[in-house]
Amino acid sequence: MRTQWVSARKGQANVSQMHYARKGVVTEEMAYVAKRENLPESLIMEEVARGRMIIPANINHTNLEPMAIGIASSCKVNANIGASPNASDAAEEVNKLKLAVKYGADTVMDLSTGGVNLDEVRTAIIGASPVPIGTVPVYQALESVHGSIEKLDEDDFLHIIEKHCQQGVDYQTIHAGLLIEHLPKVKGRITGIVSRGGGILAQWMLYHHRQNPLFTRFDDICEIFKRYDCTFSLGDSLRPGCQHDASDAAQLAELKTLGELTRRAWKHDVQVMVEGPGHVPLDQIEFNVKKQMEECNEAPFYVLGPLVTDIAPGYDHITSAIGAAMAGWHGTAMLCYVTPKEHLGLPNAEDVREGLIAYKIAAHAADIARHRPGARDRDDELSRARYAFDWNKQFELSLDPERAKEYHDETLPADIYKQAEFCSMCGPKHCPMQTKITDEDLEGLQKVLESQGAAELASVKLDKAE
């Protein structure tokens, strides 16, 4: 799709969407996003220029269908996939990608950590993906030195970061906000550092007794990113890993640094979103969202969950979707899904499906709560189909049509039941939706009430349905 769009930009010093937006140029990607979001092109350009919206669109990812992440657009969902040293391969990861896209993932992150040729897996995923692809480059940086922190130097990080850009990665999680002076603040936590990338950087600083190289070389990374239009996803290395650790001094100290880095990236016209927690009690979610907006000048917020309780391994797609819906309502721009396997193992295809549907529900609920134009239209259409007993229309409008039809057909599989005015819950005689109250019914009832003349009945006003 984008081959012709980007051909004229290649070789320019800065090809970022923010750079063009700040020059008053509406790119083809901005125009495409405007149609997808049903928003004016001028608003898209203004939001990208301001930094409140990003369009992750590496110029080397030419089969990408551009999308937007930001407060003015619909709430988005990311799905994580990736091979580990103990499970999966390239073909399985591409299948997970296709499944994630099928069930509505707006972006996908490849979190492969080893066991396969990481470049081969990443290239295959990007080549098959119509949605933006994100990565965490420190994983491959460590793998490139065979897991030896002592052998890992600053240039290794930058080499891998540029390689990912060259391969077409649209956004990269860069753990530049974790500073060496933040590490003592972790001491009082129950779960310490739960970010894999953050853990790698913490080990590096503790071994070398030097500042985080992603922080000290941040401007160099900006120079790389703007040549490819790769977007920062500023990683929250000190995100809380349990309810006890939420909103603590370590998390908030790093968040302040992430705000500073956001403004530094913007000076280079490089797009930024900021990652957030994690594990957060319900009553602290609004605070976390508002604090990020304050510290990071309203750069799009991208949260993992958050999980609102820690006692449900095997069901953390539910514990986190609860928090995700609330985070989206308060202004989070993108939700990173959590699968039932969280804290337990590498998710398989069915786990990807379960996690994604839970998060599409959360994002959609947030859009309704934020009164985004048209957000409830599909709900209303499905409700009309439900009231009319139009089963096939209900399946069609469902987030997961296959699952909806499967559950219906478990007890009433014959085609004739697709015209039935009941399901197996109430049966043919007790479904309340069979009770249809017409205008004629209301007029007749009104006459009866008036004829009885009782004070309490005479005061009843019956409103006809419009």
Swiss-Prot record:
Cofactor: [4Fe-4S] cluster
Annotated Gene Ontology cellular component terms: cytosol
Disulfide bridge partners, by residue number: none
Binding site for substrate: N80, M109, Y139, H175, S195, R196, G197, D236, S237, L238, R239, E275, Y302
Pfam hit, one: ThiC_Rad_SAM
Catalytic activity: 5-amino-1-(5-phospho-beta-D-ribosyl)imidazole + S-adenosyl-L-methionine = 4-amino-2-methyl-5-(phosphooxymethyl)pyrimidine + CO + 5'-deoxyadenosine + formate + L-methionine + 3 H(+)
Gene3D superfamilies in alphabetical order: 6.10.250.620, Radical SAM ThiC family, central domain
EC number: 4.1.99.17
GO biological process: thiamine biosynthetic process; thiamine diphosphate biosynthetic process
Bound cofactor: record note: Binds 1 [4Fe-4S] cluster per subunit. The cluster is coordinated with 3 cysteines and an exchangeable S-adenosyl-L-methionine.
The UniProt record lists the keyword Lyase: yes
Membrane-spanning residues: none
Binding locations of [4Fe-4S] cluster: C423, C426, C431
GO MF term set: 4 iron, 4 sulfur cluster binding; carbon-carbon lyase activity; zinc ion binding
Claim: Metal-binding is one of the keywords in the record: yes
Pathway: Cofactor biosynthesis; thiamine diphosphate biosynthesis
Enzyme class: lyase
Positions annotated to bind Zn(2+): H279, H343
Alphabetical UniProt keywords: 4Fe-4S, Iron, Iron-sulfur, Lyase, Metal-binding, S-adenosyl-L-methionine, Thiamine biosynthesis, Zinc
Record's function text: Catalyzes the synthesis of the hydroxymethylpyrimidine phosphate (HMP-P) moiety of thiamine from aminoimidazole ribotide (AIR) in a radical S-adenosyl-L-methionine (SAM)-dependent reaction.
Protein family membership: Belongs to the ThiC family.
Protein name per its UniProtKB record: Phosphomethylpyrimidine synthase
Lineage: Bacteria, Bacillati, Cyanobacteriota, Cyanophyceae, Synechococcales
GN (gene name): thiC
